[in-house]
């Protein structure tokens, strides 16, 4: 009976070792994903600032270079 008990204990130890390796791999994966998400959030925030700047530029360009419809001279055929 003792040999079977050792075999069972060895099987359990192998299972525990496998679970520990899986946990370590998952922890590393979570750390990698967290770092990637942090980098993407930084890039997203930076792009939002750039977009706001460009929208302001476009609005400024449109208002300064385009006359209102009431200010436009009518076409010659009127």
From Swiss-Prot:
Q: Name one Pfam family in it.
A: SlyX
Tell me the InterPro entries matching this sequence. Answer: SlyX
Q: What is the similarity comment for this entry?
A: Belongs to the SlyX family.
HAMAP family reported in the protein's UniProt record: SlyX (MF_00715)
Q: What is this protein called?
A: Protein SlyX homolog
Question: From what organism does this protein derive?
Answer: Photobacterium profundum (strain SS9)
